[in-house]
């Protein structure tokens, strides 16, 4: 899992691991950190999805302290929320704060109280923070929701993010308007379980209703991108919206996890393999250019070779291109951790095979797009992305954050090449 590092002139550094919501929250941390005036400090915004993510964070902390012995280190994020004592016991760490505390700057001060992590399950509302810029990024992130009310057997996210809490539509609209005025052409709608949006708000507005309001009230917004969506929560209204709204980008990341129905049942997922295939095929029939990403767990407890092959078949049948594959990682206290485990070496081997399957699917997707006319959103390092999230390598500098028309002409090392038109 790649970490993102942000620095400024005050010798303040933020190292972000994990999801898009963490990226969004790191921008809030950056703003608060600048206001705090703290010098020679690093905040590690951690992830708790896998043991590997936690190991990466600990290694990065030790390396940072070794390189700068006077550096003050604050650890926060989902891993800190789940295991505050683990970080509190590290000699390199000066302060540990929870997921709610990290958004409040007074918790950044180094005091005798090394750990400040409160009960996230008691939080009833998600505070709204206006983020005006995203360091070095061409697209902006909008948080519409936090927390999760589901109980997948492998997941600890509900325990580190709390119950599902939604941000009112009016507040979201105001934020999007603000970001458009700042020059952003694309916003990414993000949260922990975005398609669960609204059930806790007065009148229970749906995710689709919220998206419609944003698109209607901010006509200047050119591109909207949705983060991970849950197949089980896609109703007819939402499907119609993403199928026919050209301003919603034709790239959707699905929380699939497995292509075997028995494994999905043991995970306590609310969809089956047929519903994934049906959704992808139905949407592709309307928007042929659409691409799909998916989270896949390799080697979930009790997964047999036949069950694993069902997942491989699903990738082909649903035509999933952008795969996030993780070897199953036991999370203490979860029901899945008590199930019969698949050996580690088999998990890793299956993950390797799935990643290759994903690479093959993506390469075929690239080939089908040679000669296609697209619009590119320009990013850092001469990289851009198409509407359906194909990464494109540019041969010259173009203004970051702007949109250019181009023709895709070839493939080169995981990217497509283009000529401007």
Curated annotation (Swiss-Prot):
Its cofactor is [4Fe-4S] cluster. The keyword tRNA processing applies. It is found in: Cytoplasm. Its EC number is 2.8.4.5. Binds 2 [4Fe-4S] clusters. One cluster is coordinated with 3 cysteines and an exchangeable S-adenosyl-L-methionine. GO terms for cellular component: cytoplasm. Residues 134-364 form the Radical SAM core domain. InterPro entries: Elp3/MiaA/NifB-like_rSAM, Methylthiotransferase, Methylthiotransferase_CS, Methylthiotransferase_N, Methylthiotransferase_N_sf, MiaB-like_bact, rSAM, rSAM_horseshoe. PROSITE patterns: MTTASE_N, MTTASE_RADICAL, RADICAL_SAM. It catalyses: N(6)-L-threonylcarbamoyladenosine(37) in tRNA + (sulfur carrier)-SH + AH2 + 2 S-adenosyl-L-methionine = 2-methylsulfanyl-N(6)-L-threonylcarbamoyladenosine(37) in tRNA + (sulfur carrier)-H + 5'-deoxyadenosine + L-methionine + A + S-adenosyl-L-homocysteine + 2 H(+). [4Fe-4S] cluster 1 binds at residues 19, 47, 78. It is an enzyme of class 2 (transferase). Residues 10-112 form the MTTase N-terminal domain. GO terms for molecular function: 4 iron, 4 sulfur cluster binding; metal ion binding; N6-threonylcarbomyladenosine methylthiotransferase activity; tRNA (N(6)-L-threonylcarbamoyladenosine(37)-C(2))-methylthiotransferase. Coiled coil: none annotated. Keywords: 4Fe-4S, Cytoplasm, Iron, Iron-sulfur, Metal-binding, S-adenosyl-L-methionine, Transferase, tRNA processing. Catalyzes the methylthiolation of N6-threonylcarbamoyladenosine (t(6)A), leading to the formation of 2-methylthio-N6-threonylcarbamoyladenosine (ms(2)t(6)A) at position 37 in tRNAs that read codons beginning with adenine. Belongs to the methylthiotransferase family. MtaB subfamily. This is Threonylcarbamoyladenosine tRNA methylthiotransferase MtaB.
């Amino acid at each position: 899992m790649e970490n993102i590092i942000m620095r400024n002139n005050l010798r303040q550094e933020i190292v972000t691991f994990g999801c898009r919501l963490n990226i969004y929250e790191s921008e809030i941390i950056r703003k608060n950190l600048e206001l705090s005036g703290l010098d020679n400090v690093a905040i590690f915004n951690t992830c708790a999805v896998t043991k590997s993510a936690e190991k990466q964070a600990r290694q990065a902390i030790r390396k940072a302290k070794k390189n700068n012995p006077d550096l003050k280190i604050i650890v926060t994020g989902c891993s800190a929320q789940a295991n505050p004592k683990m970080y509190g016991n590290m000699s390199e760490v000066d302060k540990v704060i929870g997921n709610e505390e990290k958004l409040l700057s007074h918790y950044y001060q180094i005091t005798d109280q090394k750990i400040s992590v409160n009960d996230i399950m008691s939080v009833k509302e998600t505070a709204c923070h206006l983020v005006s810029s995203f360091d070095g990024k061409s697209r902006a992130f909008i948080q519409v929701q936090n927390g999760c009310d589901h109980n997948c057997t492998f997941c600890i996210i509900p325990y580190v993010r709390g119950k599902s809490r939604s941000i009112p539509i009016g507040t979201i609209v105001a934020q999007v308007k603000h970001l458009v005025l700042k020059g952003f052409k694309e916003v990414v709608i993000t949260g922990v379980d975005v398609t669960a949006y609204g059930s806790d708000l007065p009148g229970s507005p749906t995710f689709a209703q919220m998206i419609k309001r944003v698109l209607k009230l901010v006509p200047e917004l050119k591109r909207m991108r949705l983060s991970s969506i849950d197949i089980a929560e896609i109703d007819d209204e939402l499907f119609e919206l993403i199928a026919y709204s050209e301003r919603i980008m034709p790239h959707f990341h699905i929380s699939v996890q497995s292509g075997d129905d028995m494994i999905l049942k043991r995970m306590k997922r609310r969809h089956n393999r047929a519903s994934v295939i049906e959704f992808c095929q139905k949407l592709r029939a309307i928007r042929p250019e659409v691409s799909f990403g998916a989270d896949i767990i390799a080697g979930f407890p009790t997964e047999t070779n036949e069950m694993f092959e069902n997942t491989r078949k699903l990738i082909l049948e649903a035509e999933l291109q952008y795969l996030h594959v993780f070897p199953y990682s036991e999370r203490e206290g979860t029901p899945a951790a008590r199930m019969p485990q698949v050996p580690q070496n088999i998990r890793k081997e299956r993950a390797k095979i799935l990643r290759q399957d994903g690479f093959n699917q993506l390469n075929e997707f690239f080939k089908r797009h040679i000669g296609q006319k697209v619009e590119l959103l320009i990013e850092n390092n001469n990289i851009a992305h198409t509407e359906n999230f194909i990464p494109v390598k540019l041969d010259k500098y173009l203004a970051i954050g702007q949109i250019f028309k181009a023709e895709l002409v070839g493939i080169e090392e995981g990217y497509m090449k283009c000529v401007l038109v």
